[in-house]
Curated annotation (Swiss-Prot):
Gene3D superfamilies assigned: P-loop containing nucleotide triphosphate hydrolases
GO molecular function, one term: metal ion binding
Designated gene of the protein: engB
Described purpose of this protein according to its UniProt entry: Necessary for normal cell division and for the maintenance of normal septation.
Start and end residues of each EngB-type G domain: 26-197
Sequence positions that bind GTP: 34-41, 61-65, 79-82, 146-149, 178-180
Entry keyword set: Cell cycle, Cell division, GTP-binding, Magnesium, Metal-binding, Nucleotide-binding, Septation
Sequence similarity: Belongs to the TRAFAC class TrmE-Era-EngA-EngB-Septin-like GTPase superfamily. EngB GTPase family.
GO cellular component: cytosol
Database matches in InterPro entries: G_ENGB_dom, GTP-bd, GTP-bd_ribosome_bio_YsxC, P-loop_NTPase
Species in which this protein is naturally found: Streptococcus pneumoniae (strain CGSP14)
Cofactor: Mg(2+)
Protein name: Probable GTP-binding protein EngB
Positions with a binding annotation for Mg(2+): 41, 63
Amino acid sequence: MTMELNTHNAEILLSAANKSHYPQDELPEIALAGRSNVGKSSFINTMLNRKNLARTSGKPGKTQLLNFFNIDDKMRFVDVPGYGYARVSKKEREKWGRMIEEYLTTRENLRAVVSLVDLRHDPSADDVQMYEFLKYYEIPVIIVATKADKIPRGKWNKHESAIKKKLNFDPSDDFILFSSVSKAGMDEAWDAILEKL
């Protein structure tokens, strides 16, 4: 599907804890998942050419609800709570887990998940679990490796290979190196997203 999007026409629509609060229409949605402080808010702001549409926080674990971003009345980003944040109670983490699982497995509007990992580090057990979960439920996935600007370009391949190996990456999925500082990977990310709509 080819879609002309005015990405400047974007706003946060609503925050939801369960399906009774989800938007009630048929706009396609792309969910964004990743561990706390992987750069999800920076990814959203970069992709939508905004400084602080999604609030970046020095405190991980800030997003506790599903945040729906309306983009040009044609599609939505859905920011899901960052996982793997230790200073949240086990009970709270389980609640988030159920909320995320309910959204990912029952939402008909969902077209794909952008799974964000930090290019500098091996994927965490949570990253691997998320990828396996998406593959198990046959949910299309785009891996975006953030913070590419923090690593010399000559080492990108090495880090990419390490991540792919740890994830047991399916080569039919998209893998994009991304930097919210230099905007590297932004066009590739949009191409991959629009292809899924």
